[in-house]
Amino acid sequence: MGPKKQKRELPEDFDPVYPYDVPQLQINPPFVSGDGFNQSVDGVLSLHIAPPLVFDNTRALTLAFGGGLQLSGKQLVVATEGSGLTTNPDGKLVLKVKSPITLTAEGISLSLGPGLSNSETGLSLQVTAPLQFQGNALTLPLAAGLQNTDGGMGVKLGSGLTTDNSQAVTVQVGNGLQLNGEGQLTVPATAPLVSGSAGISFNYSSNDFVLDNDSLSLRPKAISVTPPLQSTEDTISLNYSNDFSVDNGALTLAPTFKPYTLWTGASPTANVILTNTTTPNGTFFLCLTRVGGLVLGSFALKSSIDLTSMTKKVNFIFDGAGRLQSDSTYKGRFGFRSNDSVIEPTAAGLSPAWLMPSTFIYPRNTSGSSLTSFVYINQTYVHVDIKVNTLSTNGYSLEFNFQNMSFSAPFSTSYGTFCYVPRRTTHRPRHGPFSLRERRHLFQLLQQ
């Protein structure tokens, strides 16, 4: 047996009588016009539209319009909400203008006032001299004596000119000049000077003075003087002894002697070695001055390194002529004083031996000849032992021993002082006690 055939389902409205299909009912209107309507092949009637008519989302017929148009009260009108636009009573779109812009039948124009002109290239400014255009900018060229500043145009002032409180230009007046009530520059004069139209003149008594070849001189006449004044030819002078001298036009009491001074200079550089190095790292100041039968000394030490608690020594070793030797720990200059400078003994024509310590009072190469002094470092007392002639067998020496030196660099000592008896020389013999003048001068040196 073959496969069993299934029964095909039939629609409920199936009519077994031929024809089997239900005929479609077509109903046509009694008339169709071709104006505005369109009928498709299948008989569908529709509207025939063209832009700007369109169907919206609800399939309703509407009008499509672009920018510049809007619906107002179910009417299509021109949108005038943009700046500078409006509609006239005729409903036409026009521009809104404001002075100096004007609107005419020909178009928009600009009302021009004085100083402006219009050309094919555009609006321009009318200028006349001295105004001019430079770099598309209006400028005012300036003549000599004028200048442009942030505050505006002003006067360029040269030397000797200024402005007063009223901003007027005036002359700067220095010493010896003045402006009179008429604004004229004059030279004030006080007696015996006289200022006139011819210039400055000198008012003098013709009885006492005479003008000869533009030079004013004292009229010669007999003048009697009494000592100590003296008259020689046309000059009156003071007669004084060798105990006085004239210094800068003043009579002063002159000492009968001039002290010798050997020193390191007022501001020496590093000149002593304080540690085990080959380069000086300390500065020592020493000044020796012979006054009569004594040598007065002052000294000070400055260090650029830290020092530990130990004795620091600075020595000066001299030969038999008083010249500083190279084996001294002091390595700087040491010579005679000339104002604030140091000069060599040969240049000064002086003998440094005259300031050397006496070998009779301070024997050579012994340890017993010493002096005592002291200095302060940061308010700390430091004892200084000064040994004399202890380092030389045929010359002289001074050795400064600073005790318990433990200070942080940099530091400077105060000035210490001492004195000793110098050797006797034939260069400057000295006998007997100090005179009154010498004692006064010695006191002045001790006060310095």
From Swiss-Prot:
Induction statement: Expressed in the late phase of the viral replicative cycle.
Main localization, broad class: virion
Entry superkingdom: Viruses
Quaternary context: Homotrimer. Interacts (via N-terminal tail region) with pentons.
Domain notes: The tail region anchors the fiber to penton base capsomers, whereas the shaft, built from several repeated motifs, allows the knob to protrude from the virion.
Note: All late proteins expressed from the major late promoter are produced by alternative splicing and alternative polyadenylation of the same gene giving rise to non-overlapping ORFs. A leader sequence is present in the N-terminus of all these mRNAs and is recognized by the viral shutoff protein to provide expression although conventional translation via ribosome scanning from the cap has been shut off in the host cell.
Family: Belongs to the adenoviridae fiber family.
Protein name: Fiber protein
